[in-house]
Amino acid sequence: MQPGSAPTETYDVQFSEKIERTRDQFKDFFNGEIDAFRSPASEYRMRAEFKIWHDKDTGRACYAMHQPKVKNQVIPIEDFEIGSARIRELMPDVLAAVNNSTLLKQKLFQIEFLTATSGDAVVSLIYHRPLSEQWQAEAEQLQSTLRCQLIGRSRKQKIALGRDYVLETLLVNDKSYTYQQVETGFTQPNAAVCQKMLTWAQTVSADIGGDLLELYCGNGNFTLPLAQNFSRVLATEVSKTSVKSALYNIEQNGATNIAIARLSSEEFTEAMNKVRRFRRLENIDLDSYQFSTIFVDPPRAGLDTDTVKLASRFDNIIYISCNPDTLADNLASLATTHEVTRLALFDQFPYTEHRECGVILRRR
């Protein structure tokens, strides 16, 4: 299958297969009905990155992607069917402008798109050369024509001609949340499925109460809707870019019960265990929190051993996983103290092997 294609006629089959794989993989931990959430069959991806291939015969640039599982094979991309409607609208216009301008094309090696459901968009042009004032003048004309935000980047140089972020609005149980999503920050790529993930997490935690600890909070994606269910939320994140966006998003959404600490999960575990003191926690009294629940959305590596031990101290665990294999490993450890009461599958990446899962664990 060519990268970026959307064979919509196969969607139902591949989704059913993912449900069965998930049921089989977690049968030792859960035997109830899986909460399974579909994706749109096409135009679901809100961000995309393309290599730029310069044809030596024609001199023209084209979009390209690596062929999955085939080393050093680059495939030209004519259409990106899984991309949002806004990405597909922008792609030919951006490429035409690049091919009509020596300044824009010279040593251009990558183009990135970040879009929102509103049509807001950031396009980043990335170069193997310094960017001049002449480049900036031409890029400003292109930005005006495209009606989007344009960024130029090269080594140790970034020129943002407007904003370097989009504003996304997601609907969770009839309430809208607005998010700043920065072009270099992590965001969920499938907005439609992201809304379903947020709604599921908020719904299944509605009756818990108490205070919430969140690790790996990113830009506050889950933090904001979950804060509706808890008295107070303490959220941690190590990325400075994400922390800055999270603080912006908390203010824009009028949330008053959320505190953010820039710590890794390992550092926070040390703080909770009183192994180390952190200046980044000097305005936060950990002992004042009455934590009932921990929420984690870790990277593919899952939770490290110490964080698993930390999570096991909470009555309720909400775990969103982008890697079912490491989730299963972590559940094997947590199963001694907790039982899985809900299991969800979110089809973030149709037509791939990728499965996003969610589990609720309650103390035995």
From Swiss-Prot:
Family that this chain belongs to: Belongs to the class I-like SAM-binding methyltransferase superfamily. RNA M5U methyltransferase family. TrmA subfamily.
Gene transcribed to yield this protein: trmA
Function text: Dual-specificity methyltransferase that catalyzes the formation of 5-methyluridine at position 54 (m5U54) in all tRNAs, and that of position 341 (m5U341) in tmRNA (transfer-mRNA).
Protein name: tRNA/tmRNA (uracil-C(5))-methyltransferase
InterPro entries: MeTrfase_TrmA_AS, SAM-dependent_MTases_sf, TrmA_MeTrfase, U5_MeTrfase_fam
One biological process term in Gene Ontology: tRNA methylation
EC number, as in UniProt: 2.1.1.-, 2.1.1.35
Keyword Methyltransferase listed: yes
GO cellular component terms given for this protein: cytosol
Reactions mediated catalytically: uridine(54) in tRNA + S-adenosyl-L-methionine = 5-methyluridine(54) in tRNA + S-adenosyl-L-homocysteine + H(+); uridine(341) in tmRNA + S-adenosyl-L-methionine = 5-methyluridine(341) in tmRNA + S-adenosyl-L-homocysteine + H(+)
Keywords attached to this entry: Methyltransferase, S-adenosyl-L-methionine, Transferase, tRNA processing
Active-site residues from the entry: 322, 356
Domain of life: Bacteria
Enzyme class: transferase
Binding site for S-adenosyl-L-methionine: 188, 216, 221, 237, 297
Molecular function GO labels: rRNA binding; tRNA (uracil(54)-C5)-methyltransferase activity, S-adenosyl methionine-dependent; tRNA binding
Organism expressing this protein natively: Teredinibacter turnerae (strain ATCC 39867 / T7901)
